[in-house]
Amino acid sequence: MLKRALVWGGAAVLCALVAVGCGGGGADGGGGEEGRYREEIVIGWTPPDITGVFKTATNYFERAAEEANAAGFNVKIQAQSPATHTAFADQLEIIENYVSQQVDVIAVSPADTEAIKPAIQRANEAGIPVIIVNLLEPQEDIEVASYIGFDNSEAASVSAYAVLDYYGGPGVLGEGEKVNVPEEQYLDLQWWEKTYENADPGEIEASGVVIEGIAGTFFSQERLDGFNEVMDQYDGVELLGEPIAADWNREKGVEAAETFLSRYNPNEMNFIWAASNEMGLGAMAAAQRKGVLDDSGGRTPPEEGKVAIFTNDVTPESTAEIRDGKIIAETHHGFAEWGWIGTKFGVQLACGQDVPQTFDIRPRTVWQGNADQFYPNPNLPEIDWQKIKNDC
């Protein structure tokens, strides 16, 4: 049975959530009595902070480890994060500590890709396989066994199309042309681009603002670029002012939204796009407190004097807000898949097995009409732990 303990370190500078797994007996795998699967497999996982999105990923690292241990493995997920998303040096130190502890595999969601490279290079030198989640773009100067994630620019483009949909374009939201979508259909970038091949830009009209992450960093810039790339094609959409950086933080998201709400009245500012879930939930709270939140769920035409919230990530918390209509649409980044597939690939790497170089989450739109497909019970691929054990 998987035991969990909350560990706090670094005088409140670092926060750690440690999941300790104890392997069961199970049938012998292909390795026989001396099979690698019988030994403890430690996966050192470090997200950039401990907010809801990364807690969701950690939970699914643990759930996959529970399944592996039930099949006879002895997998331990050791999870530790910086206290804040801007504590780049702390995440570097965490990875270096994992190297010193000689964990079997390191999984990391970088707070900043450049900042962690020296620590990843140390892991490479020590022969410890590294999995990077939250992006697919290959990184120079380091060796990465597998990337689990998505193209951040594409994810933001998906969000941009959801905004266009709500304000007159074809799709599933607002008053534009309705597109029949089978339940199994992903509303990913490919679907949106095909849907908008013959869209009339003149039908789409809106104005809004952007809350970005940490200004100038890889993830924030990629998302800004992807969002703007789509919006620049539609003259009827106006982005007011410059983005405000909220450092992927909910409280700062509240402050950024309040700044925009004081600067523009709801009749001229129709929407807020926040580039992450925490900031989006903050923007939602600010608009709700001011009495201007659009809580229609996107099923009716936008109401004058209301501000619609669009964001990126998708967690159990934000999915509940989508169901309640308070977030119009959010782009799924696959946090459950990060953990679920991350543990699978980590165990396979510890067993000396090959894993895919990339696992694409395929960012896609979540809205009131399909929210039940995501949380509380995300649709995850089955893992054949018995086969992995037999080959270990």
Tell me what each language-model feature is:
Residues 1-10:
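Bacterial N-terminal signal peptides that target proteins for export
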Residues 22-392:
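A residue-level marker of the well-folded mature domains of exported/periplasmic proteins
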Residues 12-16:
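Alpha-helical transmembrane segments
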Residues 10-11, 230:
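Enrichment for repetitive, rod-forming helical segments
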